[in-house]
Structures are given as structure tokens and as C-alpha cells.
Amino acid sequence: EVQKNLEYYIVNGFGSSMYRGLMLDSLKGRSVSRKSGSNQAAGREAMVIILQMIDSLSDEAKETMLSTMKYWMEQNPGFVDGLEGVENLAIKKRAREILEDSSIVAAVEPLHKSFQYMDRAVNRLDDYLFAVSMYSERTQNTEIMNDENRMGWHQNNGMTYIYDSDQDQYTDNFWNTVNPLRLPGTTVVPVNIGTGTPDSSGYAQGGDYCSNESWVGGSTIGNYGISGMSFSGAS
């Protein structure tokens, strides 16, 4: 059971939540506001974990992740060189073995994935990935905490992301410069919701809330899917 869960998290979790070695911002919560928490940095952390675990997977799962890792590393060539320090020697060696193994085909399969417990959807083809962030009575419009992501009010109001060959699009100060009231894909009244008054932590941590709506999610058939969100905004 533990083995099955491990493989599910790696293959269906990490394998569905990254693009060319980048962790999708739609899945990162308030960490999008951290300079140290870019999709490049988060993706590197995930790839290190996968390399540590890859030889513990079953043959089928291992074959899938070897192909995926080789593809990500080829598309993100700075990853291996960035593995510095004694603690990364074995990981760097394994990464180079994968890259130099001609029997491993670098590939990532197309997919459409609905993360029903997170109210997210991902559609991935060879040359792009499209993601949608939603929220419902189960999830919040954003995550505001510890003085982080203070203007994230509309991040899950149907915000859309398109990842393509520009790997710096969401890494190069995107969240510092984008208009938080006019996020891509959203149709909202551009209101500064604020963060309320400070609580016992000393931080004002309001501005995030669940929706009153339950009709949020999608259906998937193979690599095709459809998503929808009943949206009522703040109340």
C-alpha cells in the first residue's frame, strides 16, 4: 500500500504538476510571492526528490519517470549544473546517468488532469501546457498568510496560465509586476479586498475565503477534458 501511494504521488502528482521542470504556479499557494519560491526553484526541489526515489519504483512507474526526468532535464539544462554541494553528489551522478543512457527515451505524455480536491485543471501537449485555477466551497480564492501573497485575492477566480518555450514567463518577477486585479482569464470586479486587521500573529491575514458554490470541477476522458466553475465572488 505504501509503495502504491508513493508511486501515485510521484507519477500522478509530480508528473502532472510540472512543465519542462517547472512547478506550476497554480499549485503553489502563497509561495508564489516568495523570491526563493519560483516555479524554477520548486521544480528543482521536486526533481531532486524524484531522483532520490526513482530506483524504488516498480518497473512500469520507473520507466515512465525515467523518460519524464530525461525530458525535463533536457528542457531545463541548468538543473544538473545547479546540483552543488556534497549532499547532491549522488543525485547529480544519477541525473547524468539518465541523460547519458541512450535506451531512455525523453518524453512526456499529453494529458488532461482535473485535481478535484484542489479545483485545478491542467491540459498538456508537446509544446504547451494550459492550467486553470478555480475555487469552491471546498477551497479558497487564494492563500494569504504570514504577510505573504497579500494581493492574491483573484488568483483562483478562473485564472489561466499558458506555459510554452518561455521558461521565464512566471519566474522573472511575474507576480511582482502583474496587476492583481486583472489576472489573465479572470472576469471580476477589480476590487482591492484587503487583508483585514492584524490577528494575534501580528499580521493581517484576511482576504481569503471559500466560495458558496459547489459546482466547480471537471470531467476527463483520456487526454480530453472540460472544466467549469459556478462563481459568485466575495460575500
What are these regions (language model features)?
Residues 64-235:
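Catalytic and substrate-binding regions of extracellular carbohydrate-active enzymes
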Residues 2-4, 54-67, 97:
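Structural helix-adjacent loops and short alpha-helical linkers that scaffold large soluble proteins
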Residues 37-41, 45, 60, 64, ...:
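Alpha-helix boundary/N-cap detector
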Residues 34-38, 57, 121:
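Conserved aromatic-histidine-acidic binding/catalytic patches
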Residues 1-52:
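Aromatic-lined, polymer-binding surfaces characteristic
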Residues 50-57, 72:
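Generic structural signal for hydrophobic core residues of well-folded globular domains
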